[in-house]
Structure formats: C-alpha cells, structure tokens
C-alpha cells in the first residue's frame, strides 16, 4: 500500500443470496465488498468477503473480513485478518475475553489479539 492512487471501491456479485453492498457507509478506494456493510467506515484496501457483515464499525486499511464473519460496533486495526465465521461485537463477555471492549460497548481488535487466539 504505497502512496499511489488506488482504484475505486468495487462491489461484487449480483445474486439473490450473495451481493456486495454498503448502506449509509463510507468506503475508500481499493476496497472490495462481497458482503454487506451498514453504517460503517472502511479505509483503503479493505476486503469484505462473501456473506460477511460489517455493522456500525470502523475498519482500518488492509483488513480482510472472512466469509460469514460478523463484525458489529468494532474498530478493527490495520492489517487484521478476521477469520471466516468469526463473530465480533455480539457477545460482550466473549469479546472482553478475546479483545478489548470499552465501557460503551465498542470492541477493539488488533493483529496481536487475533494472533493470540490462533495459538
């Protein structure tokens, strides 16, 4: 991710059960959205894979959101890879164990936190 200009965001698939879309969101250049994004901000070069959802979240550059993953009320740090089927922001107790959860219910996810989970 150098200083050059990125291509525009791309929304892919046009099938009834699989359609990339963003509603009331800001999506930066270089993003590819195959899942659903709602009231969120995606920084550059974010990939939201098929059947994934990102709701009320801020996703920093270079993040990959895996297939069928669900991210709600979260801040995802730069370069993170959210594994397929992972759920973030829906279970306060589980989120507090795995990540950092603020008093207001926002979950912060970093690469280091995800690496600890993989061990």
Regions found by a protein language model. Give the residues of each.
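Left-handed beta-helix
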Residues: 1-119
């Amino acid at each position: 991710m150098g200083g050059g200009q990125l291509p525009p965001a791309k929304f892919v698939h046009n099938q009834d059960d699989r359609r990339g879309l963003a509603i009331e969101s800001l999506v930066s250049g270089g993003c590819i959205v195959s899942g659903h994004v709602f009231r969120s901000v995606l920084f550059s070069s974010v990939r939201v894979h098929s059947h994934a959802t990102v709701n009320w979240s801020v996703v920093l550059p270079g993040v990959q959101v895996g297939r069928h993953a669900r991210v709600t009320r979260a801040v995802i740090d730069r370069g993170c890879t959210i594994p397929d089927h992972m759920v973030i922001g829906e279970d306060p107790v589980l989120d507090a164990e795995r990540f950092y959860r603020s008093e207001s219910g926002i979950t912060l996810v970093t690469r280091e936190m995800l690496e600890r989970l993989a061990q």
